[in-house]
Amino acid sequence: MVTIEKIQDAIIEAIKQSGMKQADLGEKIGVSQSTIAHYLRRRIMPSLDTLSRLCTALDLDANEILCVERPKDF
């Protein structure tokens, strides 16, 4: 089961792995550096729209982060 903590873990790990500065990532996705810092400190959770932009900026698959299974091809 997906939990908020698992989503946060995935986001935090991806941000750290990216090597991007918080300010640069924030500018890229349209949020402030302090908002990125709040994500890293688990104070707030990004909206789905922001999560989508984060995934794009960090080259992540949103389905994996949200633990959504993709339909299998028949």
Where do the model's predicted regions map?
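A short, Lys/Arg-rich alpha-helix, primarily the initiator
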Residues: 1-20
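Residues within the helices of the helix-turn-helix
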Residues: 12, 23, 34, 52
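The alpha-helix within a helix-turn-helix
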Residues: 15, 26, 55
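Recognition helix of helix-turn-helix/homeodomain-like DNA-binding domains
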Residues: 30-45
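DNA major-groove recognition helix of helix-turn-helix
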Residues: 40, 58, 66-69
